[in-house]
Each structure stands twice: as C-alpha cells, then as structure tokens.
C-alpha cells in the first residue's frame, strides 16, 4: 500500500526548538561535538559532548546545570539512556580497549571521572569491532549489546545495586553481518535481534548454545535504526521495504503492507502510532553553475496510526536526524527529534477535541466516531458528533441515514427540531413518516419520551397503517410508561394503574384515529391496556366491534361501582342488542347479588352464548318465568343455579343502588322492565332498604301494569290488571305500616292513587261523580287517608272531598289541615263546597275544638289566597282573645299567691337556719314528744318545733366533730331522709350528662324535647344549694 493512498491529518503538533545558545560560546544541543543524548523529563536533557563529557541541560532555563567527565580521554560515549528516572546509563568505546558501561544515580551525579554508581566492562577481546545497538531492561538486570560483526553479548546481574554481573555471548552471526536491531521485551525474558538478512528471537533465561530460539524472518533483515519496540503491546516492530511487521515474544506475527523503499529510521511513539523517517531527494534552488548542481537530501517525518491506517503527521526536516527519544507528561507522550542543525523538534499529540474537529472539518464523521470510541470520549461529546453527522447526511438528502444518527444523540439534540425536520419542513411522504417513527421509537425505548412524543408516534403508525408497529407498542410499553424488551404480560392485573396520575398519550385522539382507520381490534387492545375509563372499553366493544355479549362479560368483570356506571350509560343500548343477558346483569346488580368475574376475551373466537336461539329472541312477561328459563338454558352466569345457590344465604357485600337510576333505559322495553321491577321487588325485603324507594318501584310497576293492560294483547289484559291490583294492595299495606311505625318516615302513595283514578278502565273513571267512598274504604281498610284525600282533590268534586273529610276527619289529624288549604285555594272550590258557613261548621269548628291547628297557622293558611275574608274568622279571633285574657288573669293570681307563699317560707327558713340568734324555747306546760311526760332538763329542742328528753333520744356521733353529740328529730326523720335523697338526686342530674342525652334520644323525648329540658331544669340540672338541712 502506497503512502499516497492513506488519508492524512495533522493530528500531532510539531514545535521546532532551536538551541537558544546557537551561535554563542556555551552551546547546548547544537554543539558539533555532540555524540549522544537522552531525555529525563520535558525540562531536562542529558547530552554527551567532546567524546566523554556529560552535561545536564535545563531546557526551561536554557543552561547547563551540571557537567562532568564520565570516561577517560581515549573513550567516546556512544550511548546514553535514563532508566525509570533514577539511573543514567552511559556506554563508551575505545579502540583496542574493552568497552565500558557506567551507571550513575541521577540524584547524585559525580563531579569527576572516577566516580560512578556501578560499572560493567564488556569482554569482547581487543574490541576491534564497534557496537551497533544496545538494549537495557527497565530494572537494569539485563543488558544486551550488538556489534557490527554480528556478535551479541548478554549481561545479567544486579547492576542497580552494584553487586556484580555475568556476561556471555549468545550469538555470533556466521556471515559476520552487523546487528542492526536489538530489543529486550518488557520482562527481559526474550530478546529480539535483527541482522541485514534475518530477524531472530533469543531466550535470555537459558542456554541457547549460540543459536537463536526462533528465526522470525529468514528472508529479510533490517537496516540500522529500522526496528523499534512497543512496550504497550510488548511487540517488536520491523520496518521492511514493503511491509511493517509486528512480532510478539512467542513469535506470532502480523503485518500490513506499506511502501517504505526510502525508509531511514523508525520509532514507536505510543501504542498505535509509529514515527518513520524517510529520505527524499530535492533539487537545490541556488543560482550556481549547472556543473555544481547536486541533489539535496531531506528527511520526511511521518507518524502513522497503525490501528486506523491513517497518517497523523507529515512534515520535512532538511537536516540529519541525530537521535529520537521520548518522555511523558500528564499522561501525554512527548517525542523529541534532535537534528544536526541544533534544532530539536518537540512532537505532541493534539487534544482529542482538536483531532476530532480536524477530522470533522474534512467531513469524515465515521472516522471521527471511531476515534472518539477508541479514546473513550464522553458520551455527550460522542452524541454531538452523531448530531453533526446527522445534519450532514440530512443536507445530503440521506434521510434514513440521518435518522439513524439522530437516534444516537438523543441527549444533545433538540427533539422538536428533529420532529420539525421530518414532519413540517418535509413533505409528509411515507419515507419521512417512517424516519420520524424510527426517531420517536428511539425516544420511547430510551425512556426520554414525553406525552406528545408517544401520541405522535401512534399517529404516525396509524397513518402508515403499521399494524405490526402498533401491536409491538401495546406488547412492550407497560402501564408505568416504560419500554420493555420482552413482551409485558403481567401488568394487566395491576390495579394501582387506575389510581395513578399516569397519562402517557392522548388516548381519546388515538382511539378516534383508529376508528377512522378501521383498526377495531387494535383500538380495543389499546383501550383495554391504557384506558382508566371502563366506559371507553364498553363503547368500543358495543359500538365499534358490535359485540354486546363480550361487552356484558367485560362489565361483569368490573368492580360494582364501575359496573353500575357502565350500566347507567349503556344499559339502553345493551337492552336493544342483548335484552335478556343485560336484564339478568341488571337484576344481579340491583338485587345485591353481583360479584365480579374474570374476563379473558378472545376477539377472534366466536361467542355462542347470548340471547339468540335459532335467531329468535325469547320475551318474558314475569320475573318467575324469566328466572326459570335462564336456569334451564344456562344462558346467563348471573342467573345460573349455582350462582343462585351461592347467593341464597349470603349477605350482600354492597348496598344495592336505587333501581330508578336505570328506569329510562327500559323506555322501549316494557316486558323486560316488568321482569326487572319484579325482581327488585322480590328481593327488596332482604336488604332493609328505604320504604320510599320501595314505593317508587311499586308506583312504577303499577303504572307499567296499567299501560300494558291497555296496550297488550287481549289475552293478557286480565293478568296485568290482576297484578296491578296486587301492587296497589301492597302499596297500601306499606303506607299503613309506615304510618303505624312512629320511628319511620311516612310513605306517600298518592301518585299511585292518581294513576288509578286516571286509568280509563277503572271504575272511578267511568263515573267520577258517583264514587262510593264507603265501598272504597271497606276495600282498603289499610289505606293512607291523607294520600287518598290528596288524590281526590285532583280528580273529585269539592263536595265529594267534603264528604270524605266528614267521614275520616277524626281519624287523621292532618286531614283537616290539608282540607282547609284545599277549600280556600280557589274561589270556585270554596263556592262549590258551601261557602263561609260550611267552612266554619265543617272545617274550622272541628279544628278549633280539637286543637288541631294553632290560630296563627289558621290565619296563615287562610291568608295565602284572597278567597277567605276577615269575617270568616272574626268571631273565632274574638273568642280566642277572650279566652287568652281570662287565662292571663288566672295566671297572674296564681303568681301572686305563689309569690306570697314563697316569701313566707323563705322567712321561716331564714329564721330556722340562723344559729347565731338566741332562741327562746318555752318549757312550761310542755311534754316530751316521745314519752309524753312533763319536760325536765336536760332536754333537746329541734328547730322544727319538736322537744324531747335527752334520755329519750338515741345519741349519734357527729362525723365532723367527734366530741359533739348529734341527735335527729324522730318525727321529722322521714322527711329529712326524703330531702337528702332529693338533694342527692339533684347532684346526680348535674354530674351525669348521659341521663339527659338518653332522655332526649328516647322515643318519648324525641317528640317533645322542650318538655325534657324544662323537666331537667326543674330538677336542679343547672344549679343546686349546698345548705345542710
């Protein structure tokens, strides 16, 4: 491969540094006597000048900081090397004398020739052949020296500690070809050697009997300086005319073709880069005579990247290369080229960022990505390269390839910008949409998508008719919004999804688009997995897939509240499509027997269950026949015998809802409505529901029966009327039961009575004016008189209502109140019932005498309309005022007498309890109240007026004063104990609030709480006296 075919970049920086003392007296590395050089660190250079003088040059100071004579005058230094930054190794030769290797410690360099750390004298006879190459191990334990006569000497020993060494000849070339390359591997167990015709491998740890362990290349050898060693890979690099070969310590070889016919020197820069020096011939530009024209030799410097097959640096040096050496700083390799003109070229790799920018400028993005990967560039920087590459490809019109690059840089690219490129700026052709879909897929799979991204992806998939893509989305995108590589099957039972606030995409919009694209089954699967609203799934099953049976099965699998919600919304539609199955489910829900079932529906499998038998729908006229048929045919899980048996003795887990919420669904289904209402009524007693709700069912069922009696076939008219009569009788019983039970609310069935009166086939409708009230009452002994009267006010004559009032007014207390409001509601009604006299006699007089209404309520009732005049109640008001005046006077007299009596008792009590005033006790002609004998001292006088002999009384010790005698009046003892009991009772009333609460909440107390409160106040509930009687 020719060099011209390799891509070239300037990825290294070359800085020529001329000797700052060039042309002066104290030359540094431009000294013409310079014979060897080595580097310690980027700031310290060691050179050998004048054959045997070693100088330490500080490059940053441009001065020699130390120098000394290292060898005798007849020796010349030909080799310098720094080992591990600790030792300096110098090799010097002298014709006719053994060559010397001296080791110095860098921290203790000598000042004169005789001082050194250790020395090795090469045993090479009279040393008539000069040394060509030297290699030293990193620990100074092994040194190999090659000569131009083909001899190799191996030196082993503890040289770093100056403990002696041994040396032996490991090879002598039979053809006396010079040793052109010699390198020890990293652990000094093997030595690579090369002559001008062969490449050899020696084992340094054993006896090789003067023969190589392995001949690596028997056909080609190396020129001097055309071999190097790569410590990073532990490989020997051989630069041949057409190849560059790499050998490992085991002899394995790999190579690549490279045209280096004018090679001159090779040096390993780092793991992947090799510096090569080649010669080029140029024509001088001086204006001298033609005869004096001669070719000019110049050196071209290449740094090749053996890994990526590129040229990383290319420049020309017009002078000879004296030596090449390297060091490192901050992890960066620094290579130095020392030339004969006193210029030292400092070669360093450019920063990775600069290298990549140089490559990007040449639009070689794949190589830039490759280089970034090799050097472990940060992920964000790599993504920036992908972004630039994507922009480049997009401009070139390679949309698919650009999309692939944008997918690789999701963290640095502006998502809206990419979407705009493929969706807005571009014509929405299928290819652009597919590219946009690929990009959106990558957002989702990397969990950086937002709600709009997921929505847009589904829209694109729908537009592309990509059924497989939508199916993949449903299978792998779970209910937590996370993409999974495997198919997600276990999150459908995760109920926490329904209580979360997750909203991954616009489900309503996607379902609408699927509906327009006729993706029926996919829309169901999508809604089943991601919809939190069961109504959406039912709508798809019912209206899109037209599968009411499966819709009912799905509704059965929901909790009771969701089931009820679906039934309220779709029961009308379900009753039209599948009436019996729907009715069975409604009965189960509204009778408290519903329990959710499992739902595993295969949309591809035909469901054979349902309401169809030989394409004819069965119609039922009662709940009993419906229940028997469903059991016998096994068409409903809800009504099966096993289900009925399991629910027979089982308490409901929820309170059945009011059936009235689905009444509107049965508008066109009267027979199904009959079955539903009868089922609800049959199970009503089991759940102790409200009587008002039961009355609603009775009223609705009654009206339904009467309507069917008018509109159904003649064969069933009598049955409907018979059922209506039974429902009316049951309603009257309910009204009577509620009226007799004081704890429950009253039940109003007036609407049923109104329906009965309005029914065209009832007896009352045929002759309204001849209604026989007595007969009606006899037929309905448990009827609600108040509801009946209200119903009569709507359909009967006022005179008929008055007759009803005369007959039942004394039985129902509120009947007179309702009648009074009715008779004065309209002037025509007032006139027809008889006017003022009849109202006074038949209505007002019974109210006043029976005290059914306060006078104020009577006045309010009459004043609501302008029918009644003041003269109607004038006499009543006058009589009331007189009665009240008489009552007031009587109460005033009672107050005066009570006040006088209270004052007398207070005075007497005050005198009695006053112990400080002396009390005069008359003893003359007094007898003892106990023995009835004449009194003689000592006596005991009580303030109640009773007096006794002291010996006639029983003595008791005072609990407060032990020395004081305590006596109690025998005659007043009973009254005293009674007073004490009353006093204790008052204390108990004050301290025990639960007594008051119990009294207020009792049946009697709840009727008149004011009476309970006043009674407790009278018993001293607020305050009490501490006076001891």
From Swiss-Prot:
<feature type="region of interest" description="Disordered">
    <location>
        <begin position="637"/>
        <end position="656"/>
    </location>
</feature>
<dbReference type="GO" id="GO:0006886">
    <property type="term" value="P:intracellular protein transport"/>
</dbReference>
<dbReference type="GO" id="GO:0006904">
    <property type="term" value="P:vesicle docking involved in exocytosis"/>
</dbReference>
<dbReference type="GO" id="GO:0045324">
    <property type="term" value="P:late endosome to vacuole transport"/>
</dbReference>
<dbReference type="Pfam" id="PF12451">
    <property type="entry name" value="VPS11_C"/>
</dbReference>
<dbReference type="InterPro" id="IPR024763">
    <property type="entry name" value="VPS11_C"/>
</dbReference>
<dbReference type="InterPro" id="IPR001965">
    <property type="entry name" value="Znf_PHD"/>
</dbReference>
<dbReference type="GO" id="GO:0005768">
    <property type="term" value="C:endosome"/>
</dbReference>
<dbReference type="GO" id="GO:0033263">
    <property type="term" value="C:CORVET complex"/>
</dbReference>
<dbReference type="InterPro" id="IPR000547">
    <property type="entry name" value="Clathrin_H-chain/VPS_repeat"/>
</dbReference>
<keyword id="KW-0808">Transferase</keyword>
<dbReference type="GO" id="GO:0031901">
    <property type="term" value="C:early endosome membrane"/>
</dbReference>
<dbReference type="GO" id="GO:0000329">
    <property type="term" value="C:fungal-type vacuole membrane"/>
</dbReference>
<comment type="subunit">
    <text>Component of the homotypic vacuole fusion and vacuole protein sorting (HOPS) complex, which is composed of a core of the 4 class C Vps proteins PEP5/VPS11, PEP3/VPS18, VPS16, VPS33 associated to VAM6/VPS39 and VPS41/VAM2. HOPS associates with phosphoinositides and the PX domain of VAM7. Component of the class C core vacuole/endosome tethering (CORVET) complex, which is composed of a core of the 4 class C Vps proteins PEP5/VPS11, PEP3/VPS18, VPS16, VPS33 associated to VPS3/PEP6 and VPS8. Interacts with PEP3, PEP7 and VAM7.</text>
</comment>
<dbReference type="GO" id="GO:0007033">
    <property type="term" value="P:vacuole organization"/>
</dbReference>
<dbReference type="GO" id="GO:0036205">
    <property type="term" value="P:histone catabolic process"/>
</dbReference>
<dbReference type="GO" id="GO:0006895">
    <property type="term" value="P:Golgi to endosome transport"/>
</dbReference>
<feature type="compositionally biased region" description="Basic and acidic residues">
    <location>
        <begin position="644"/>
        <end position="653"/>
    </location>
</feature>
<keyword id="KW-0862">Zinc</keyword>
<comment type="function">
    <text>Required for vacuolar biogenesis and for trafficking of hydrolase precursors to the vacuole. Mediates transport at the vacuolar membrane where it may be responsible for tethering transport vesicles on the target membranes. It is required for gluconeogenic growth of yeast. Acts as a component of the HOPS complex that acts during the docking stage of vacuole fusion. HOPS is an effector for the vacuolar Rab GTPase YPT7 and is required for vacuolar SNARE complex assembly. It remains bound to SNARE complexes after vacuole fusion.</text>
</comment>
<dbReference type="GO" id="GO:0048284">
    <property type="term" value="P:organelle fusion"/>
</dbReference>
<protein>
    <recommendedName>
        <fullName>E3 ubiquitin-protein ligase PEP5</fullName>
        <ecNumber>2.3.2.27</ecNumber>
    </recommendedName>
</protein>
<keyword id="KW-0653">Protein transport</keyword>
<dbReference type="InterPro" id="IPR013083">
    <property type="entry name" value="Znf_RING/FYVE/PHD"/>
</dbReference>
<dbReference type="GO" id="GO:0061630">
    <property type="term" value="F:ubiquitin protein ligase activity"/>
</dbReference>
<dbReference type="GO" id="GO:0008270">
    <property type="term" value="F:zinc ion binding"/>
</dbReference>
<dbReference type="Pfam" id="PF23341">
    <property type="entry name" value="PEP5_VPS11_N"/>
</dbReference>
<dbReference type="GO" id="GO:0005829">
    <property type="term" value="C:cytosol"/>
</dbReference>
<feature type="zinc finger region" description="RING-type">
    <location>
        <begin position="928"/>
        <end position="973"/>
    </location>
</feature>
<dbReference type="InterPro" id="IPR016528">
    <property type="entry name" value="VPS11"/>
</dbReference>
<dbReference type="InterPro" id="IPR001841">
    <property type="entry name" value="Znf_RING"/>
</dbReference>
<keyword id="KW-0813">Transport</keyword>
<dbReference type="GO" id="GO:0030897">
    <property type="term" value="C:HOPS complex"/>
</dbReference>
<keyword id="KW-0833">Ubl conjugation pathway</keyword>
<keyword id="KW-0863">Zinc-finger</keyword>
<dbReference type="Pfam" id="PF23356">
    <property type="entry name" value="TPR_PEP5_VPS11"/>
</dbReference>
<comment type="similarity">
    <text>Belongs to the VPS11 family.</text>
</comment>
<dbReference type="GO" id="GO:0042144">
    <property type="term" value="P:vacuole fusion, non-autophagic"/>
</dbReference>
<dbReference type="GO" id="GO:0007032">
    <property type="term" value="P:endosome organization"/>
</dbReference>
<dbReference type="GO" id="GO:0035542">
    <property type="term" value="P:regulation of SNARE complex assembly"/>
</dbReference>
<dbReference type="InterPro" id="IPR036322">
    <property type="entry name" value="WD40_repeat_dom_sf"/>
</dbReference>
<keyword id="KW-0479">Metal-binding</keyword>
């Amino acid at each position: 491969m020719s060099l011209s075919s390799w891509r070239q970049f300037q990825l290294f920086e070359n800085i020529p540094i001329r000797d700052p003392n060039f042309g002066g007296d104290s030359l540094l590395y431009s000294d013409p006597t310079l014979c060897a050089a080595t580097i310690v660190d980027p700031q310290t250079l060691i050179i050998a000048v004048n054959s045997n003088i070693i100088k330490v040059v500080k490059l940053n100071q441009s001065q020699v900081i130390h120098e000394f004579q290292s060898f005798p005058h007849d020796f010349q230094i030909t080799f310098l090397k720094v080992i591990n930054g600790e030792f300096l190794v110098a090799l010097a030769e002298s014709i006719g004398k053994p060559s010397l290797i001296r080791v110095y410690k860098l921290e203790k360099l000598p000042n004169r020739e005789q001082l050194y750390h250790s020395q090795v004298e090469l045993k090479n006879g009279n040393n008539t052949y000069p040394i060509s190459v030297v290699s030293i191990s990193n620990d100074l334990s092994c040194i190999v020296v090659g000569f131009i006569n083909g001899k190799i000497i191996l030196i082993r020993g503890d040289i770093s500690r100056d403990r002696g060494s041994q040396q032996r000849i490991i090879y002598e070339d039979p053809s006396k070809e010079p040793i052109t390359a010699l390198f020890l591997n990293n652990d000094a167990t093997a030595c690579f050697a090369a002559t001008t015709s062969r490449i050899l491998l020696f084992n340094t740890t054993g006896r090789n009997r003067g023969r190589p362990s392995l001949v690596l290349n028997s056909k080609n050898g190396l020129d001097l300086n055309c071999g190097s060693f790569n410590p990073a890979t532990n490989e020997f690099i051989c630069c041949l005319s057409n190849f560059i070969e790499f050998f490992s310590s085991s002899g394995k070889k790999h190579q690549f073709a490279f045209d280096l016919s004018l090679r001159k020197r090779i040096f390993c820069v780092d793991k992947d880069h090799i510096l090569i020096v080649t010669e080029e011939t140029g024509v001088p530009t001086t204006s001298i005579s033609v005869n004096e024209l001669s070719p000019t030799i110049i050196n071209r410097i290449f740094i090749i990247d053996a890994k990526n097959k590129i040229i990383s640096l290319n420049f020309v040096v017009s002078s000879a290369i004296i030596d090449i050496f390297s060091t490192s700083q901050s992890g960066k390799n620094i290579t130095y080229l020392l030339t004969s003109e006193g210029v030292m070229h400092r070669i360093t790799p450019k920063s990775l960022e600069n290298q990549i920018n140089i490559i990007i400028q040449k639009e070689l993005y794949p190589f830039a990505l490759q280089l970034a990967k090799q050097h472990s560039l940060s992920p964000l920087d790599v993504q920036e390269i992908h972004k630039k590459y994507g922009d480049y490809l997009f401009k070139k019109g390679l949309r698919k390839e650009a999309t692939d690059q944008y997918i690789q840089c999701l963290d640095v690219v502006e998502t809206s910008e990419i979407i705009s490129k493929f969706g807005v700026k571009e014509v929405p052709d299928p290819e652009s949409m597919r590219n946009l879909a690929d990009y959106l897929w990558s957002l989702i799979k990397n969990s950086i998508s937002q709600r709009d991204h997921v929505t847009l992806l589904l829209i694109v998939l729908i537009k592309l008719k990509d059924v497989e893509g939508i199916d993949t989305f449903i299978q792998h995108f779970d209910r937590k919004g996370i993409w999974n590589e495997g198919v997600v099957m276990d999150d459908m039972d995760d109920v926490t999804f329904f209580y979360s606030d997750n909203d991954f995409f616009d489900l309503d919009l996607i379902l609408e688009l699927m509906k327009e694209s006729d993706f029926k089954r996919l829309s169901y699967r999508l809604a089943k997995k991601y919809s939190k609203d069961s109504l959406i799934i039912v709508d798809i099953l019912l209206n899109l897939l037209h599968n009411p049976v499966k819709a009912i099965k799905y509704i059965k699998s929901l909790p009771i509240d969701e089931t009820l919600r679906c039934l309220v919304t779709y029961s009308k539609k379900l009753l039209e499509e599948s009436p019996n199955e729907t009715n069975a489910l409604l009965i189960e829900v509204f009778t408290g027997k519903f329990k959710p079932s499992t739902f595993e529906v295969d949309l591809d499998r035909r469901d054979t269950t349902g309401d169809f038998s030989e394409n004819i729908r069965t119609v039922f006229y009662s709940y009993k026949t419906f229940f028997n048929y469903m059991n016998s045919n096994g068409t409903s899980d809800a009504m099966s015998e096993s289900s009925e048996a399991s629910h027979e003795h089982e308490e409901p887990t929820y309170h059945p809802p009011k059936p009235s919420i689905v009444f509107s669904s049965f508008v066109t289904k009267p027979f199904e409505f009959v079955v539903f209402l009868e089922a609800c009524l049959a199970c009503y007693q089991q759940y102790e529901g409200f009587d008002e709700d039961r009355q609603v069912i009775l009223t609705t069922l009654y009206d339904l029966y009467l309507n069917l009696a008018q509109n159904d076939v003649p064969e069933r008219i009598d049955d409907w009327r018979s059922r209506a009569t039974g429902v009316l009788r049951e309603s009257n019983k309910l009204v009577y039961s509620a009226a007799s039970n004081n704890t429950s609310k009253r039940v109003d069935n007036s609407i049923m009575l109104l329906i009965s009166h309005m029914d065209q086939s009832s007896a009352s409708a045929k002759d309204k004016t001849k209604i026989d009230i007595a007969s009606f009452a006899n037929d309905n002994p448990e009827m609600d008189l108040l509801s009946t009267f209200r119903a009569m006010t709507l359909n009967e004559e006022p005179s008929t209502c008055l007759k009803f009032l005369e007959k039942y007014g004394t039985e129902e207390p509120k009947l007179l109140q309702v009648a009074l409001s009715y008779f004065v509601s309209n002037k025509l009604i007032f006139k027809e019932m008889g006017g003022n006299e009849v109202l006074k006699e038949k209505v007002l007089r019974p109210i006043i005498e029976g005290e059914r209404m306060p006078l104020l309520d009577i006045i309010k009732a009459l004043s609501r309309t302008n029918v009644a005049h003041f003269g109607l109640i004038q006499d009543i008001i006058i009589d009331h005022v007189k009665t009240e005046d008489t009552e007031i006077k009587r109460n005033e007299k009672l107050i005066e007498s009570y006040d006088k009596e209270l004052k007398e008792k207070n005075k007497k009590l005050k005198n009695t309890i006053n112990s400080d005033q002396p009390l005069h006790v008359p003893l003359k002609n007094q007898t003892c109240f106990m023995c009835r004998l004449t009194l003689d001292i000592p006596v005991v006088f009580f303030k109640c007026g009773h007096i006794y002999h002291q010996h006639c009384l029983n003595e008791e010790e005072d609990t407060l004063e032990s020395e004081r005698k305590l006596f109690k009046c025998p005659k007043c003892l009973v009254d005293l104990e009674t007073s004490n009991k009353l006093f204790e009772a008052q204390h108990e009333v004050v301290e025990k609030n639960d007594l008051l609460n119990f009294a207020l909440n009792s049946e009697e107390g709840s009727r008149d709480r004011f009476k309970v409160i006043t009674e407790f106040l009278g018993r001293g509930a607020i305050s009490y006296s501490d006076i001891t009687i």
